[in-house]
Structures are given as structure tokens and as C-alpha cells.
Amino acid sequence: MEQQQGAEDVPVIYLHEIKRQYLQGEVPLTILDGAKLALWAGQSVALVAPSGSGKSTLLHIAGLLEAPDSGEVYVNGAPTSQLPDIERTQLRRTDIGFVYQSHRLLPEFSALENVMLPQMIRGLKKSESVKRAKEILGYLGLGDRITHRPAELSGGEQQRVAIARAVANAPRVLFADEPTGNLDPHTADHVFQALMQLVKATRVSMLIATHNMELAGRMDRRVSLSDGQVVELE
């Protein structure tokens, strides 16, 4: 399965001294305080931390969806803080994929059309988008469900379509925020297995926020957040 290639002597994503505060009423609340994290090509990393610790904020900043108050996000070794919005958007479309706890599929579109959409936005021909969408959905065991709309799919199938959509543009890194959080344990296990198989097949890097220590234990590294900083777990 096609996957973008790049230099492997620098991290795909590197967070350097990331700081982020929010206002709680009129009181500033520090979420991230000098956080550092390197994510290497083909590496899967679990971010395990309590609710409210800043997991989603870290993922959003790493994925260029949110700007830090200070610090720098490097993508493929290049700083991104001074990029124009249009270039940041283009970088998200080409190098970064997202999977959320809620699948966020477009209800009026079929599974195939949902996976085609990011490719069409990027400018790929329809025939190429159809071919790649079918390939990914087939790899995830959904080859016979491509014409079904989200409401006609089970929860696990919906999330697998969301995963297929996230990797449709062959990103270099995938961010997943509690991707199995809404699923029962059996379905969550199947979805997670499919996700890990796809990650290994494409050598995409992945940072996944999860409460599930058993699933986190299957990944290459485990990190947490403590006092606004990233710490490695055994």
C-alpha cells in the first residue's frame, strides 16, 4: 500500500518546549508547560493520561489544528509556527491524518465517498480516488460495505471507515484521540487491530491518546503528561 517517504534521520513530528494556557474564568490554567516529544517514522506511541490533563490539546497542537502560546512544532524537521495558514492547511492535508472518538463521517455519503473526499479535496482524479478508497476499505475488511452510508454500518465499521479516511492521502503521521472510546471491548479490540495492521503496512507514524492500558501496551512507546510535560512510561 502506497505511503509517502521522507528523511528518517529527523523525527516526523517534534514538539519543542510547547506551552499552552487557557483561561478558567479569569484565572490562567496551564495545560502544557515546556512539553517535548519526538515521533519517528513508523513508530506507534500511546499517550496515556487522565481526562483534563491536556491529551487532546497536545494532539491538536502536534497536528497543526491549534497554535501553542510558545514553542515550536517541527514537521519533517521544518518549523511550522511562521507558516501562512494556507501552507499549514496544505501540510495537514498531505502529511497528517486524524481519527477521533466520534467517527465524524458525513451521513449523506457512502463509506466509499467518505474515504474519497479528502483525496478529491487534495486534487486527485476521481478514478484515482475511487481506486485508493476501495483498496483501503478492502484492507480493513469493508470491501462489501463500500456503498453503505454511516447509519447502515455498525459502530466498529463506522470507525474503520474513519480510519480509512484518515489515511486516504497517505499521511506520514496519524493522530488518534480515543479512537475506540465509544466501542465495546470486543469491537474496540478488532478496530485497534485493524488500525495497527494499517500502521505497520504503511509505515505511518501514530500518536494515539487512550485510557486503555491494554491497548497502549501493544504500541512501541508509552508516554504520559505530568505537570504539563511529556514523560516516558515503562
From Swiss-Prot:
ATP binds at A49, P50, S51, G52, S53, G54, K55, S56. It is an enzyme of class 7 (translocase). Gene3D superfamilies: P-loop containing nucleotide triphosphate hydrolases. Keywords: ATP-binding, Cell inner membrane, Cell membrane, Membrane, Nucleotide-binding, Translocase, Transport. It is found in: Cell inner membrane. Residues 13-233 form the ABC transporter domain. Its EC number is 7.6.2.-. It comes from the Bacteria. It is a peripheral membrane protein. InterPro entries: AAA+_ATPase, ABC_transporter-like_ATP-bd, ABC_transporter-like_CS, ABC_transpr_LolD-like, MacB-like_ATP-bd, P-loop_NTPase. GO terms for cellular component: plasma membrane. GO terms for biological process: lipoprotein localization to outer membrane; protein localization to outer membrane; transmembrane transport. Part of the ABC transporter complex LolCDE involved in the translocation of mature outer membrane-directed lipoproteins, from the inner membrane to the periplasmic chaperone, LolA. Responsible for the formation of the LolA-lipoprotein complex in an ATP-dependent manner. The complex is composed of two ATP-binding proteins (LolD) and two transmembrane proteins (LolC and LolE). Belongs to the ABC transporter superfamily. Lipoprotein translocase (TC 3.A.1.125) family. This is Lipoprotein-releasing system ATP-binding protein LolD. It comes from Bradyrhizobium diazoefficiens (strain JCM 10833 / BCRC 13528 / IAM 13628 / NBRC 14792 / USDA 110).
